[in-house]
Amino acid sequence: MCIRDRKLTWWKNEIDCRTFAVTKLAETWAHSLDVYDAMKKDYEDTVRVEHVALFGWLNAEQASKVNKAKYQDLRIELIGPEYKAWQFGDEQSENSIKGNASDWCRVVTGRVPKGHKLTLSTEGDFAKKFVKFNHVKI
């Protein structure tokens, strides 16, 4: 068995090692935002935020359960720092979220500042609901 396929128990859930590692990277990034906010400093994302973007997509089904919504396939298309393009999910999905990777990452880690206007566009009912979910603040 490949180690990335091994299951771990985490917060009463079983997750694979890859998802666990990506989750820990996302958590570290999110807490870095908290520190910058406390110091009233701006945080500039780098291409390493791709791991946080992947976390958001990998965690979409769990976020749906927490918000008592029926999960549907979700396509994510993002432009990251240095104009890197990142896509996750089936191209044929009826639900998609497109836009700035920084906004996506802040949504999925529960770090959208009050009054911040998101630059994400949505297509499909599930995608519209997803960006408004109460995402777990990791």
Predicted regions and their residues:
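Short, small-residue-biased leader/transition segments that mark boundaries at the very start
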Residues: 1-3
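Phosphate-handling catalytic interfaces
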Residues: 7
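Short, contiguous alpha-helical
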Residues: 11-65, 104
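Charged/polar, low-hydrophobicity segments characteristic of intrinsically disordered regions
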Residues: 58-73, 133-138
